[in-house]
Amino acid sequence: MVYYVKIGIGSQYGLAKYLFDFVYDRQIRNLRGSGKMLVFSLNRMSLPADQVLHKLEERGIRINHYAEKYISHPRFSAGQPGEITAAVVSLEELGLENGASLEELFRHIQGTPFRPCPPDTGFFLRLAWTDQPQSGNSILTGTHRSPDQAVTIRSEILVQDDAFPKGLYLRKVDGELWLRGYVCDPAYHFPGETLFAFETHRT
């Protein structure tokens, strides 16, 4: 089963949820049919970095310095405006029970309906997804693990430098919504329970 959510900014789209039967695409050979995924339809607009940061502040969404650095990159909002579909699914549901690095994950989704999201997907998803489940682990210093209930946006790498953020992730802590950037080296192994968002299409 899949939860499908139609989302946009402002009054363009109301927030509605639909539960419908989903037949997994045969191309996703390793995806276990017993699971669930969230599918979001997002209306993307081309916004400069200062407007993105202002909108986040206006909505009371917290960010870290890695997120600000990522958002300020010239390629962050360089894509064409329009509607995209993003799916949130765990590595386990993709058949990666033991987890994967970003490169292993990229290779694993080749030939499936999943592909990396445009860099600004996390921004639009964060504005819309206000009822994200709460994270249980609010303090993560020194853990080097993905936060509980966090969703990592699998987007293209903007800069081939391990000191530059690889992307964004969404979490909700103590009732506050966050959009955070993260850094990791190529060898970092995301656990199997990690939730990722990909661009996809409905089958």
Question: Where is each model-derived feature located?
Answer:
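A binding-site-centric feature that preferentially detects glycan-recognition modules on secreted/surface proteins
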Residues: 1-203
